[in-house]
Amino acid sequence: MKKRLIALVLVTLMVLPLAACGKKEEVKDVDFYELRTKMLEAGENLPDMQTASSADDNAAELLGYVSDMDYEKVSNFFVSYSSEGLTDEIVVIAVKNEDDAKEAKESLEKHLTHRKNLFANYSPVEGAKLENAILRVVGRYVYLIIADDRNAIEKAFNEMVK
Amino acid sequence: MKSNGFKITCVVIVAVLLLAGVGTSICYSLKSYKAINEYVKEMHEKEEPEETQENDVTIAGSYKIRSTEAISDAYKSGDTSALDDKQKETLDMASKILDEIITDGMSDYEKEIAVYDWMCKNLANDSNLLVVIPAGSGDTDNPYGVLKYHNAVCVGYATTFRLFMQMMDIECMVIHNTECYHSWDLVKIDGDWYHTDIYSDVGRGQYAYFNMTDAMRSSQESWDTSYFPAATSMKRNKAMENIIECAGLSDIPGAIGQSIMDGNLSFVMKFSCEVNEEFARRAIAVIDIFSNAIDTISFPNGGGMWMNGYRWLPNDDGGFVLWVSVYKYGEEEDNSDALTEEERDEITSAIYEMINTIQEKLGGNGEGEGGIYDNPDGSDDGEFEDDNVDGVEDSDDSEGEDDSEGEE
């Protein structure tokens, strides 16, 4: 009886923290170059795109254009953007610790607001696309997709990461 | 004995759980305290907005408005000893341009137009402004880079225009909007201040953003009116040079259409009928419909146009005028050879018929008398008459109402 009770208490103690933390989303580690390629391929109507990524020498500086989060917390990222100054943009940030995903999302929200303000002042017609932007967190990944083919691009992301 | 052991075990477990609970509570409290502190600090910062100033303001997060008075002072005094090499080169470039475009005896207004024309013709908008990670073209926000590379962002246009004005002893300020996303100029001509935004006119409209009043500018932007001087005079506004005399509501569609075709994207309509509150509202309602229709215009290369602003403004003669500004983006392609002469005549005829129908609906006589649009070939064959009034109901009531309101 005593052993059973102790076992029950111990099991409860083990399970409680899991319940408190909630269920974490299972995601795969992916090759970022491949992820970027697949997502860009899915965007059939994307204009000419340039890419900056964690592979660049000045990666921390480049990420600073879209996110003000501490680069030490980032394990990988890429930013693909229209070289002609259109709104089209794909950003994926993988953080080292899943708890920092929220911070990454908030930083991309700020970036999106900045882009909306910029286009409202300089190119309102093109800026309309920003209203349909997709910004989501999946596990330790955060992604922002601004494109006509946003659903197809998001699907390509999910197929690789989930 | 067995019972005692069980009790001790239970007490230990409860004690451990309580300790864990207390520990967790302390951790969460500390975390919450930190978060609240940060929030309070953030709110405190938000409550104390920075004081408005003309210079040392960063626009769109990247471009800084800097004073260029050292250069204009050196131009006026002829003493360049206080300038660095970059400033000397800027002065040299700016002086050469003024020598080229300014002639003796020009008024301040004529000088302003000369500079505006030169800038609109010779400078181009830097597309880097909208690129997420801009390529390093540099110096697009100051006269040195603008005059050297002829590529500018809004701050570059504004500071370069101000430099020219200050070199000629014309008062000028660089003004920015409340959100710090755009900047343009306030220039004082013959004792009155006006808004001039060359960035928005380059490659688009002729003088659409030239010498605007506060009322006109506030259609597009907001700014700190307690800091920047008020611009209320219509005297040197370009739209006032494009006055279209209208008899009543029925002249509005033709006036707008003709002005756009003539390339006057900023113009005013002056009415010979009484402009009372009811008439003013009805006129705005007509332009609302036009505004929606113009939004649908698109050029084959992706360009188009929209109504940038329209409102009643007090005229310097004590009356009111209706100001309209149309914004055009992209370039129209020359498709003049795409239609045969016969097709062109037929379509032109149909369009005039349609406009006459609109005029009729608004209370005009629909036969061209006094209207802005007259069918150039004088024909009234009615070929397109029915086809072009689909969806527009003939309503005696509405005609009657408009007759009483819109015409003299």
Segments from the language model and where they lie:
Chain A
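Short Gly/Thr-rich strand-loop-strand
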Residues: 98-137
